[in-house]
Amino acid sequence: MKPEIISLLISFMDKVVLAILVGLITSGMFLCILSRCRPTIDISPIIAKGADTISGRTIYRIKVINRTKSPIVDIKSQLHVFKNHQTATGEIWKSKTVQLKRSDPIVIDKYDKLDADVNYAYRFVTYEDLEKIWDNDNVQFLRFRIYARHSISGFGAFAYRDYRLKRNTIRSGEFSKGDNFEIA
C-alpha cells in the first residue's frame, strides 16, 4: 500500500476510535449522574388509627414522605398481611391483600420544607379492620410496599416497611402535618 493511503487510514481510524471512546465515556458519566436521581421515600414506622371525618368509620393511615428534590410519579402501593404456615417440607408465607382506598396517586410533589400545604407527604388509607385481620403477632405481620418513578430521570425505586408487633404499630390519632411521623 502507498504511504498516503496508510496515513489516511490511520487518521480515519484514530478519529473514529476517539469519537467512539469519547461517546462511551460521556454516556457512562451521564448515566452515572442520572442514576443518582432516584426517588427517596420514607414510610411511617406506625399506623394511625382514627375516624373518617365524613362517615365516622374506623380508618387506618400510613404516611409516606417524598424526600426527593423532584416529584415522583407512577406510584403504586400495596398492603399485605403475611401469615406463616407450617408444611411437611418447612414453613411458607401466605399473603392476603388489604384494600387501600387510595393506592395509586398520580404524583407526590417534591420535598420542600417551605411548602405550607405539605404536598410532599401522602397518606394511604384503608377501611379494613387491621386489628381484626392481624390477630397473631407470632405468625403474622403487615408489609406496606410502594414503587415510584423519578419524574425527571425515569428511574424507579421500591421501598417497603414491615410492621411486626401490633401493639407497637397501631396508634390512635392522626398524623401531624409536616415533615414527621408524629401522631397527635
Task: Give the positions of each predicted feature.
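Membrane-embedded hydrophobic alpha-helical segments
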Residues: 1-35
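Membrane-proximal, non-transmembrane interaction regions of membrane/secretory-pathway proteins
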Residues: 48-182
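Low-complexity, acidic Ser/Thr/Pro/Gly-rich terminal tails and inter-domain linkers that flank the onset
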Residues: 32-56
